[in-house]
Regions:
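Catalytic-core segments of class I nucleotidyltransferases/pyrophosphorylases
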Residues: 93-97, 102, 106-115, 127-130, ...
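Conserved beta-loop-beta/alpha segment of the NTase-like Rossmann-fold superfamily
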Residues: 34-139
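Residues at the starts of beta-strands that form the adenosine-phosphate
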Residues: 19-21, 120-121, 194
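A conditional alpha-helix N-cap/helix-loop micro-motif detector
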Residues: 2-3, 75-78, 179
Length: 230
């Protein structure tokens, strides 16, 4: 829709009143930095006096965001990026998400679920649609029904929207540049019974491949984007 997917994710959080962001950058960090550094002027009505180089801003259309762009290294994996952000986040609960998926996640419900659980980390669980359509078949071969890509009833995946307590940093070693958050840290949190799940029954879609981008763009252009809750 003409905006980075990161912008869409931030708009979802901002809808619920969360406007303080830390973006952990790596590859193409200069592109992300340029986008936010120039965001104010790109979204303002201005008068430019070319003889004096004076710029007068009449009105801006920016969100009330405070965005910290924190470079964590080109090749650092997810756990290492999170660990490096500890110095910025401090000793407070925080939300964590990947930069490649959008959904109509009820952030308030997610946070409430997390607080009620008493766990140190809550992930958003989502039932994906099946890869193929399913048939209902009688013993004599008669097809009784056909379901187009039904949700897989016994399969839940990590949709990448987390609420974390600062204790999660204890599960990430200092030397963690080659460690994925989803591997040792998250598995060990689960092993210790400290990982909670919030089941999201609405819309969620990752943008892993070109077709995903095309599908999401089509939804946006047709004004049928379920994640546009703002």
């Amino acid at each position: 829709g003409g905006y980075p997917i990161l912008w869409h994710i931030m708009k979802i959080d901002s809808h619920y009143g969360f406007n303080d962001f830390v973006v952990l950058t790596g590859y193409k960090q200069e592109v992300i930095k340029d986008y936010f550094v120039n965001y104010y002027m790109a979204n303002s009505d201005v008068t430019v006096d070319l003889s004096t180089n004076e710029v007068v801003v009449h009105r801006n259309h920016c969100e009330p965001w405070k965005v910290t762009l924190f470079y964590t290294g080109r090749n650092c994996l997810t756990a290492g990026r999170i660990k490096k952000a500890q110095s910025i986040i401090g000793n407070e609960p925080f939300m964590l998400t990947y930069g490649d998926g959008v959904g109509d996640i009820d952030i308030n419900a997610l946070i409430k679920n997390h607080k009620n659980s008493g766990k140190i980390c809550t992930l958003t669980a989502y039932q994906p649609e099946g890869r193929w359509g399913a048939l209902g078949i009688e013993e004599d071969g008669t097809v009784t029904n056909f379901s187009e890509k039904p949700k897989e009833s016994n399969l839940w995946i990590n949709a990448g929207y987390f609420v974390c307590e600062p204790e999660i940093f204890d599960y990430i070693p200092d030397d963690s540049e080659n460690i994925m958050w989803e591997h040792e840290p998250l598995k060990n949190i689960a092993r210790d019974g400290k990982l909670n799940s919030y089941k999201h029954s609405g819309f969620w879609h990752a943008m892993d491949m070109l077709k995903d981008k095309q599908d999401l763009n089509k939804m946006w252009q047709e004004n049928k984007a379920p994640w546009k809750i703002w």
